[in-house]
From Swiss-Prot:
One cellular component (GO) term of this entry: cytosolic large ribosomal subunit
Function field: This protein binds specifically to 23S rRNA; its binding is stimulated by other ribosomal proteins, e.g. L4, L17, and L20. It is important during the early stages of 50S assembly. It makes multiple contacts with different domains of the 23S rRNA in the assembled 50S subunit and ribosome. The globular domain of the protein is located near the polypeptide exit tunnel on the outside of the subunit, while an extended beta-hairpin is found that lines the wall of the exit tunnel in the center of the 70S ribosome.
InterPro entries from the UniProt entry: Ribosomal_uL22, Ribosomal_uL22_bac/chlpt-type, Ribosomal_uL22_bac/org-type, Ribosomal_uL22_sf
The protein, known as: Large ribosomal subunit protein uL22
UniProt lineage: Bacteria, Bacillati, Mycoplasmatota, Mycoplasmoidales, Metamycoplasmataceae
Length: 129
């Protein structure tokens, strides 16, 4: 959320999801700069835990765009999707000789921004960076 929210856009976020950010970013990279309808198809055919979380988040952002901002759902594109580190739960696994090995249960914060774009070449310029 480093940049300001645009006028013709809508966003949604979810926090404290029990998935490693590194694994979730693999799925997030698949839908960045894609249309919302194309992103839904990609997420439904991706067999990863993160795809379910991001699909719910994308549907929420589409609902925010249509109901709150009054945008056209067919012209929405994923302009920003972020997966950041959340708090880490630290657990210990007993090991030999009285030792304990640390297990880090990582969590993630997700943020998605959809922008209504009439000219498709605008999004292609952003995707070429």
């Amino acid at each position: 959320m480093a940049k300001e929210i645009l006028q013709n856009s809508a966003h949604a976020s979810v926090r404290m999801q029990r998935i490693s950010p590194r694994k979730a970013r693999l799925v997030a990279d698949l839908i960045r700069y894609k249309s919302a309808t194309q992103a839904i198809v990609i997420l439904k055919h991706t067999h990863k835990k993160a795809s379910e979380i991001i699909l719910k988040l994308l549907n929420s952002a589409i609902a925010n765009a249509t109901n709150n901002a009054g945008l056209d759902a067919t012209k929405l594109y994923v302009t920003t999707i972020l997966v950041n580190d959340g708090p880490t739960l630290k657990r210990f696994q007993p090991h030999s000789r009285g030792r304990a090995y640390a297990i880090l249960k990582r969590t993630s914060h997700f943020f998605i921004e959809l922008t209504e774009i009439n000219n498709v070449e605008e999004i292609n310029k952003k995707g070429d960076k």
